[in-house]
Amino acid sequence: MKVRASVKKICEKCSVIKRRGRVMVICVNPKHKQRQG
């Protein structure tokens, strides 16, 4: 899980979602997991 100021899709399988008011990126590749903070 990377915590970043700006979250972006890294590959085409990444999807940007909102959970509990936080913007997150979830993907089949666990290295692509990000959250805004």
Curated annotation (Swiss-Prot):
Keyword check for Ribonucleoprotein: yes
InterPro entries: Ribosomal_bL36, Ribosomal_bL36_sp
GN (gene name): rpmJ
Cellular component GO terms held in the UniProt record: cytoplasm; ribonucleoprotein complex; ribosome
Family that this chain belongs to: Belongs to the bacterial ribosomal protein bL36 family.
Protein's GO biological process: translation
Protein name per its UniProtKB record: Large ribosomal subunit protein bL36
Superkingdom of the organism of origin: Bacteria
GO molecular function: structural constituent of ribosome
PANTHER family: 50S RIBOSOMAL PROTEIN L36, CHLOROPLASTIC, LARGE RIBOSOMAL SUBUNIT PROTEIN BL36C
Keywords per UniProt: Ribonucleoprotein, Ribosomal protein
